[in-house]
A protein has these predicted regions:
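N-proximal low-complexity "stem/linker" segments adjacent to membrane-targeting elements
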Residues: 2-54
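Cell-envelope/extracellular polymer assembly enzymes that use nucleotide-activated donors
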Residues: 30-33, 63, 206
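Acidic donor-binding segment of Leloir-type glycosyltransferases
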Residues: 50-97
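Glycine-rich, basic loop-to-helix element that forms the pyrophosphate-binding segment
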Residues: 95-115, 174, 178
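Conserved donor NDP-sugar-binding/catalytic core segment of glycosyltransferases
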Residues: 128-160, 229
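A recurrent flexible, glycine/aromatic-enriched loop bordering the glycosyltransferase active site
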Residues: 154, 166-185, 198-200, 206, ...
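Catalytic donor/gating beta->alpha subdomain of glycosyltransferases that bind UDP-sugars
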Residues: 194, 199, 205-261
């Protein structure tokens, strides 16, 4: 049965401030709680809910919890419309507004803490689970298994953009919360997601590393599948995402060995070199040393050109994409160095 009324949803929205202090009791009739954080992406959320409503698992065996990290009445009405659309044919559906703190980590924590099942399934509002997603994952969670990672499919164009290729690489990693199942007791023992991470990827990697350190029994399956279409990012997205390097510093501080093994083997020395020769060129210009300035400019052009070539390799060579790569390759090294050093200072860690 689908439980939702507009009045109930509005009350939940208004009284969500204390929700993180409450633990919902386990309901033995509900085997799995699906947590879907959302950020005002109505079309994508609608597609995700449609896919969840079509699950082959019996509706009474699972519930759906939508956590709105940007609470507004548009998302509220979209979720409530599913009651009218599905009537009593669908699973229990809960809308939960997240008044803050915000971010994927906080939203996911709000969701699993009100879940009624012992098994928590995480996906994204942009993901489309296969009809047998839940039915395929549950048997893998045997008594001795703590968590399960499923398969994420990302349809990729023959010549993707550099950003899309990077997104595919991240989703092809061994752990991603777009398709993740975990026992509630494990989440409680670990304290859930670390809400200090504003970036979803950092919070996911942190939980993954904690599970590996625990150690938890983490299993991968190719049978539980979600599809996550690659979105078209705004122009210059690769530059704006550099600010997440601040969170990378915290991740490195918490898990230095695993960070070097699984994320980045060492500092991006090429960025530091490009910034250094640019600094030499500027300083030489100020001090009227034209020969040194010219050498610095040439070295900077060579380094920036090498970065452009690397980023364009195997990606789209459309005029718009090439222009974006050229401009952002000029900006990325100094901004990357700035945000990495900002993270190192903020979290007092030697992170380069």
């Amino acid at each position: 049965m689908l439980y939702l009324s507009l009045a109930t949803v509005e009350a939940t929205m208004q009284n969500a401030n204390g929700i993180d202090k409450v633990r919902a009791p386990i309901d033995a009739s509900v085997e799995v709680s699906v947590v879907v954080p959302t950020w005002g992406r109505l079309d994508q959320l609608d597609s995700c809910l449609d896919a969840l409503a079509r699950q082959t698992l019996a509706p009474g065996r699972f519930e759906i919890i939508v956590v709105d990290d940007e609470p507004d009445h548009n998302t509220l009405h979209l979720v409530s419309s599913w009651r009218m659309r599905r009537l009593e044919q669908g699973p229990r559906l809960t809308y939960l507004a997240n008044p803050g703190p915000h971010g994927a980590a906080a939203a996911r924590n709000r969701g699993w803490r009100v879940a009624r099942a012992d098994i928590i399934a995480f996906t994204d509002d942009a993901a489309i689970p296969d009809p047998d997603w839940l039915a395929q994952a549950l048997p893998v969670l045997s008594a001795d298994v703590d968590a399960v990672c499923g398969k994420i499919c990302m349809p990729l164009a023959a010549t993707p953009t550099e950003y899309q290729r990077h997104a595919l690489r991240k989703r092809s990693a061994e752990f991603a919360c777009a398709n993740f199942f975990c026992r509630r007791g494990v989440l409680e023992a670990e304290g859930g997601f670390d809400e200090r991470f504003a970036d979803a990827d950092c919070s996911e990697n942190d939980l993954h590393f904690r599970l590996l350190t625990r150690p938890a029994r983490l299993v991968h399956t190719e049978r539980a599948v979600v599809t996550q279409p690659l979105r078209t990012p705004p122009w210059g997205a690769s530059v704006s995402e550099l600010r997440h390097s601040v969170g990378q510093a915290l991740l490195f501080k918490k898990h230095p060995r695993l960070y070097r093994e699984k994320i980045q083997g060492g500092p991006p020395w090429d960025y530091y070199a490009i910034v250094a020769v640019l600094g030499v060129a500027i300083a030489a210009t100020i001090t009227s040393s034209p020969a040194v300035a010219a050498a610095g400019v040439l070295a900077w052009l060579w380094g920036t050109g090498a970065l452009c070539r690397r980023r364009l390799q195997g990606t789209s060579h459309s005029l718009q994409h090439v222009a974006e790569i050229l401009v952002t390759s000029i900006l990325i090294p100094p901004l990357a160095v700035f945000w990495r050093l900002a993270g190192a200072l903020r979290y007092r860690v030697r992170f380069a």
